[in-house]
Swiss-Prot record:
Consists of three domains, a large central CORE domain and two small peripheral domains, NMPbind and LID, which undergo movements during catalysis. The LID domain closes over the site of phosphoryl transfer upon ATP binding. Assembling and dissambling the active center during each catalytic cycle provides an effective means to prevent ATP hydrolysis. Some bacteria have evolved a zinc-coordinating structure that stabilizes the LID domain. Catalyzes the reversible transfer of the terminal phosphate group between ATP and AMP. Plays an important role in cellular energy homeostasis and in adenine nucleotide metabolism. It comes from Geotalea uraniireducens (strain Rf4). This is Adenylate kinase. One of its GO terms (biological process) is AMP salvage. InterPro entries: Adenyl_kin_sub, Adenylat/UMP-CMP_kin, Adenylat_kinase_CS, Adenylate_kinase_lid-dom, P-loop_NTPase. ATP binds at residues 10-15, 127, 199. GO terms for cellular component: cytoplasm. Its EC number is 2.7.4.3. GO terms for molecular function: adenylate kinase activity; ATP binding; zinc ion binding. CDD domains: ADK. Pathway: Purine metabolism; AMP biosynthesis via salvage pathway; AMP from ADP: step 1/1. It holds the Pfam family ADK.
Amino acid sequence: MNLILLGPPGAGKGTQAKLLIKRFQIPQISTGDILRAAVSEMTPMGVKAKGYMESGALVPDEVVVGIVRERLEKNDCLNGFILDGFPRTVAQADALKHMLVCMNMSIEHVVSMAVDKEELLQRITGRRTCRLCGKGYHVVFDPPRVSGRCDECLGELFQRDDDQEETMRKRLDVYEDQTAPLITYYENESLLRSIAGVGSIDDIQQRILSIIQGTHG
């Protein structure tokens, strides 16, 4: 099963991917993780990426695609994979398609998790993290027993810069500009299935499974 999960920041892609990994015993491939690993291992593409990163430049698509290919060639991807954070643009999607053809592989499912912008803002801006132990909370959905203090160590809770409303709105704007066109791209490829990314974690997981198992209407 070769799957792409699409959705804006805060849609819950990471949470759903973890459940799918456990169920299907396939790897979740995060471009951030594999980029760092390729640089650390000094793979051919990792060496190229290192040069761009050290100069402060964006790593070009052809290098990112090459690093994805290096990862997909590993044995743990033989039974499938979940792509997380890639592709981000139509150009990357096109490059991925042609790369997979060369590898005699293809994407089987593209699941788009739709969540209202205000819901996303509430999810993200409500996050709080303990400065001492790193435990996460949410002011609405998972509040601490004592406001502003960690249940475990009584450390101060803080809001990460990435979780502040202004930053989050900018991230959502970038998603709309760059990544949302992927929805049209994969619709044209007859691969896209959209689900509501709201409700319980189990409810959302069942919607994804119904697509994978061919029972989604």
